[in-house]
Amino acid sequence: KVDSAKKTLTALNPDVDVVTYDVRLGADNIMDILAGYDVVIDGADNFPSRYLLNDASVKLGIPVVHGSIFRFEGQVTVFDPRGGVTYRDMLPEPPPAEFAPSCAEAGVLGVLPGIVGSIQALEAIKLILGLGEGLSGRLVAFDAMDMSFREYRLQKDPSLEVTWENRDRIEIAELDG
């Protein structure tokens, strides 16, 4: 995946410096990989990676443009750890495995990654350039079956321990799964 992505991105724009990490993202390397970046675009396809990314981004204070897909639906939001909502605010604990089949098990409409990825790219550009109203605190859900978009307000969970204010106490660890 890494080499293919780099080749494609370089072909689209040879002036872009594409940095790849051909490693499994884990508690042992995520802080080093994310350090120095201004925005993270999350396309993780599993809950352990999403929680790992959340905790590291909160500790580092890096906003995350989150995108997820399932069957005929996609979701996009921006998690802003420096005062905004985070992934753990939206979903404090991973759902039981029987309620969260993988994309391979459940199936995904082939065009959804492109739709969700385009919205994520737009949100990342807005964040970097400081333009428009971003999706921090709001989740946009796309339903391909009826071609509708819905918006949901997200709220901070005041009982959470994994917060920007507690960043020095955050232990980066991997969830089983």
Which sequence ranges carry the predicted segments?
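Adenine nucleotide-associated cytosolic modules
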Residues: K1-G177
